[in-house]
């Protein structure tokens, strides 16, 4: 018995906490970026990589209708997967939960790193100079990082096969591939105008 996948609410509550934390961490880093980080590290376009959230993040909107809609929709999908997994496909919920939660785990590693780097930049502690990221470079880097997590989850799945880890592999592969494809179609400009 596994408490995260054998009952519905622990996994759903974990997902809500991670998804909410992701949005708030993004806004915190975006605020730090505008508060001075952009003079040392400049990103082409929006700080946010996900087009769906760019307007809300650019406006530093703490309560976003888009976020609420996406959260309600994703919780509804998890509840539906739970119902299906009890009736027909026993591993559907664990797979879906893994796809959501393990992608968020990868994203949270990025948030922790950015919070550390941005705090050091704002404190003028250990970082000097200026670097500019074209949008295509930022997307490619994100894609590679997500593919790295997919392979780490795959290694864990090879040691202990289960639907939760399989979901994490597929979720990270999918999002990583999307970012890589968007990077290939993106601009490759050298100069980046800070926001």
Where are these regions (language model features)?
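Hydrophobic alpha-helical segments at protein termini of multi-pass membrane proteins
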Residues: 1-195
């Amino acid at each position: 018995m596994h408490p995260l996948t054998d009952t519905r609410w622990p996994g759903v509550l974990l997902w809500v906490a991670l998804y909410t934390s992701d949005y708030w961490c993004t806004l915190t880093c975006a605020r730090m970026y505008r508060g001075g980080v952009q003079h040392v590290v400049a990103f082409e376009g929006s700080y946010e990589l996900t087009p769906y959230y760019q307007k809300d993040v650019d406006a530093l909107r703490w309560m976003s209708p888009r976020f609420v809609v996406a959260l309600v929709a994703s919780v509804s999908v998890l509840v539906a997967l739970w119902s299906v997994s009890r009736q027909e496909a026993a591993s559907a919920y664990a797979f879906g939960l893994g796809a959501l939660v393990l992608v968020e785990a990868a994203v949270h590693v990025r948030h922790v790193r950015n919070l550390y780097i941005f705090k050091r930049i704002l404190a003028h502690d250990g970082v000097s100079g200026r670097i500019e990221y074209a949008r295509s470079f930022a997307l490619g880097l994100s894609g590679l990082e997500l593919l790295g997590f997919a392979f780490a989850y795959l290694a864990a799945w090879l040691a202990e096969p289960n639907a939760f880890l399989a979901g994490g592999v597929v979720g990270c592969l999918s999002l990583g591939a999307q970012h890589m494809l968007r990077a290939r179609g993106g601009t490759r400009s050298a100069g980046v105008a800070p926001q």
